Structures are given as structure tokens and as C-alpha cells.
């Protein structure tokens, strides 16, 4: 699922999507995409199931400096966002979440947006590809292969945080990890992602 908390929908697009009932026809879907597209940066995909704007909901418990919940969302505590920015970590797009909590001392939490700028290497996708859609002709997609590596030429230079096209991966640099780990233990594990 694509999540772009920094993209705030407004006007007709916001009110139309709030009233929308799913499933819908392909024609209606294309009309909705046309409404949203001008509000979304050109490098970001607009696909069914995507979410825009800050996450809204309820928070419970204590949060470490970085949390992965649900599995496709990365949440940062406010002190982690401040430290990452102070240390000059690049590519951090952190959007404050609109959360309610019973705890009066709940720190502000931020959703980390990872724009899909890199690509997995075609050799690791191989058998995991699906054919293009017969209806809309959209390019093939793939299930995330168990062994994966990035296409070196697609890795954005100078960014410590980015996403992977077609996958819900947040890629962070060693520098990002070192900075966040200074704030104490977290429930996130990191795995090296090679490139070829």
C-alpha cells in the first residue's frame, strides 16, 4: 500500500474521495486518479489503495524512537525526527500523525514517508512478476522476493531514506540507523540490502 502522508488532498479531490464507495468502475477510478494527480508530486505513483495526508487514529502504549506498525508504516518519535534533522540525515520526510492518547505525556509521533525512488534488480524479481493488467495495461507488479537486492543505477545519490518502486520497503542508510539507535532501544530490526 502506498502511503504519502506529506500529500494533503484538498478541495474537490478530498470531498469526492471522502464520499467514494468501493468497489468502483474503471472509468470512475480513472476520474478519481485525474482529480488526485495534480496534487501529487510527479514522481509518486497514484494507485488504488494509496493513502494521502497524515495518519489519524489512536495511540496506545510506549513508543521507542522508531516503530514499525502496521508493518508497512514507519513511525518516529519527535526526538528522533529532531535528532535526524540536526545530524543532517537527508531524505527524511516526517509528517506529524493526528493521534489521540489517554496518556498526557505521549510524545508527538511522525510517519516516515519513503518516496519510491529506487528499484529492485530485475534478476531478483524474475519469477515473482505478474503479467500486465488486461484491463488498464498497467505494468507488471511482483510479490516481494525472499532474496532481494537493489538495482545500483537506481539508487538515489545523497539520500539516507528512500523507498523502492513497487514494494513497501523503507531503505535507510547506516548513518540513519546509527543516529536513531543513540536514542535507545526500538522494536525495529534492520537488514542489509545489497545492490548490483
Annotate the PLM regions.
Residues 1-196:
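Phosphate/anion-contacting hairpin/loop surfaces
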Amino acid at each position: 500500500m502506498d502511503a504519502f502522508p506529506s500529500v494533503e488532498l484538498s478541495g474537490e479531490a478530498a470531498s469526492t474521495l471522502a464520499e467514494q464507495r468501493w468497489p468502483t468502475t474503471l472509468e470512475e477510478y480513472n476520474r478519481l486518479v485525474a482529480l488526485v494527480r495534480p496534487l501529487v508530486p510527479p514522481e509518486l505513483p497514484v494507485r488504488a489503495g494509496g493513502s494521502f495526508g497524515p495518519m489519524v487514529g489512536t495511540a496506545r502504549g510506549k513508543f521507542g524512537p522508531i516503530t514499525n506498525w502496521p508493518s508497512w508504516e514507519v513511525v518516529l518519535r519527535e526526538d528522533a525526527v529532531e535528532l535526524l534533522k540536526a545530524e543532517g540525515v537527508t531524505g527524511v520526510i516526517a509528517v506529524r500523525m493526528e493521534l489521540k492518547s489517554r496518556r498526557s505525556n505521549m510524545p508527538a509521533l511522525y510517519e516516515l514517508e519513503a518516496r519510491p525512488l529506487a528499484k529492485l534488480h530485475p534478476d531478483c524479481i524474475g519469477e515473482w512478476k505478474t503479467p500486465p493488467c488486461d484491463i488498464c495495461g498497467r505494468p507488471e507488479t511482483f510479490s516481494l522476493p525472499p532474496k532481494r537486492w537493489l538495482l545500483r543505477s537506481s539508487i538515489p545519490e545523497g539520500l539516507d531514506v528512500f523507498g523502492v518502486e513497487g514494494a513497501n520497503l523503507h531503505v535507510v542508510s547506516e548513518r540513519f540507523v546509527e543516529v536513531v539507535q543513540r536514542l535507545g532501544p526500538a522494536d525495529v530490526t534492520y537488514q542489509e540490502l545489497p545492490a548490483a
